[in-house]
Amino acid sequence: MQIPQWSDLAPWTKGSAAQYAPLAHDSDTDEVESGLLSTEKRLPSATARGPITNKIVATFLALLQQLWMATRPVILSPHGKRKLHPTSWLDGVRGLAAFFVFFSHGIDVRWSMSRGGWTHGDFFLRMPIFRIFYSGPGMVSVFFIVSGYAISYKPLLLARAREQSKVFDCLVSSTFRRGVRLYFPCAAFVIIGALIKYCHLEYRPKKTDPRAESLLSTIWWMVQVIIPGLNPLTLDRRWMNSTFKDFEPVMWTIPVEFRGSVCVFILILVVAKASRAMRLGALIVSLAYLTCVGQWDIFLFVMGTFACEIHHRRQLPTHDEHETKTTNVFSRVVRSIGLFLALLPITFLLSQPETMWKNGDVWLYDWLAAHTPGAWANNMEAGSLWRCAAAVSLIFLVEYSSTLQKFFMSRPIQYLGDISFMLYLLHPWLLSTIGKRLVHIIFPLTDKLGWGMISETIGVVILLICFMPILFWGSEIATKFIDRKGVDFARWAEDRFYGVQRPIGPPKAS
C-alpha cells in the first residue's frame, strides 16, 4: 500500500493555472441550468489557497508517506525469499519460546487459575503437554541455551580453524557490544514504562506506585532501576534480585543473560587454543561442576556452547543431501514415530506447573520434585533440574532432526524469531494498557450468551483477533526503532572506543 504522491492528485488540488471557464450557452438555456453555472463560477479557485498552503499540504502528505513506509507491518511489505543459514532454527526456537512466554502472562488477565496443575474434571488444556504453550519457566530455560549456542558459534568456528587472532578480536568485540545490546532496549522500556505509570495508562492497576506520583519522582525511580540493574554480580540463584525485576518482572532475565554471556566468552577464550578433544573435555568438566553446584543459569549457557561445539564437529550436511538418504517410506515413518515419542517426555517436563500453583493430580511431578538434588532444590522455577534437562534435550533433538529444523525455519516461526526480543519486553506493557481493557469489554458481552465454555471460547477468539495484530505490529516497530538501533549504537560505540573505521551501512553477512 502506498500513499498517493502529490503529483498524482487531481489538478484542482495544486496551485496550477487551471481556471473555471463558463460553458457556452444560448438564450434558450434553462434557467435552472444557468443558475447552476453561475453558482459554479462563484466557487473559489485552487490558486486562492496560496502557495504556502499548498506546500504545507504537500509536506504533510510526504510525512504521512514516510511514516507509513517506516511503520507498515511486515505482512503489508514486499519481501523476497528469506535467506537461511544452518542455525536459523535457533531464531525460530527463540521466537516460539518468547511467544509462549507471552501466553503464560496473558492468561493471568482472566484465567490465572489455569496455571495450576490438572485435576480430574478440569479442562484438557490444563493437562501436561497441552499446557506447554503457556508454560513460561521452561521457555526461559530454552532461551539461555539458545543464547549460549548463538554467541559461541563464530568464535568456536574460528577456534576450529586455528585463527587465534580472529578469535581474540571476535571475543573482544562481542564482550564490548553484548552489554549495550542487552541493556539498551531495557533502558528504553524502563523509560516507556515510567511514562505509562506516570500517566496512569495501566488499566485498573492493583495499586498506584507512589514513586510515579510526580515527574521528578518518576525520573528518580528510573535512575534507581537502571543503574543498579546493570550490575549482574548481585544475582542469586533463587530470586535473581535485579531492580529491573522490581520494575517489570520479565526483565530479570537480562542481567542473567549478560552474566552468562560473559562467562561463555571467558570460557571460550581459555579453551580456544586447545586441541579439539581438549576443548570438548574442558566443556564437559565445566558442565559437570556446574551441575554439582546447581548453578543453573551458567550451566544452560555453557550447555549452549557445548551444543555448538558438537554442531561444528558433526559438520551437518544440507537438508537436501540428508533427505536423499531417507527416501524410504518405512524409514520416514519410523523417524516420525521416534521424533513424536522423544517430544512427549520433553514437553511433559517443560509444561510442569510452577511450585506456587501446585501439581494437581499428576503424581509424577510430585515425584520429580521429591527427587531433586539438594544443590538444585532452591533454584527458581526456570532453574528446576527437570526443566533444564528437558530444555537441553529439546535443543539436541532439534539439532539432530531435520524435520524439526524445517518447522523452526518456516516463515511464520522465523518471523517470531525476528521480533522475539521486543515481543518479550513489550508484551507486559501492552497487556496492562490494552489487553486488560479488551478483556473487560469483550467478555461481559460474550458471557451474556449463556453458552458456558462456548461463550468463553468465542471471547478468546475475539480477544486474539483484536490484540494479536497490536502485539505483532508493536513488536515490529520496537524491533526497528529500539532493538536494531541498539545494535547500531553498540557498533558505533565500539568503533569510537577502539578507533576502528568501518564502512557505513549494515554489516556484511559472515
Predicted regions and their residues:
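Membrane-interface helix-loop-helix regions
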Residues: 15, 25, 45, 49-69, ...
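Transmembrane alpha-helical segments and their boundary/interface "anchor" motifs
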Residues: 90, 94, 133, 137-140, ...
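Alpha-helical transmembrane segments of multi-pass membrane proteins
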Residues: 101-113, 350-354
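Membrane-interfacial alpha-helical segments at the cytosolic side of multi-pass membrane proteins
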Residues: 149-155, 260-273, 307, 430-442
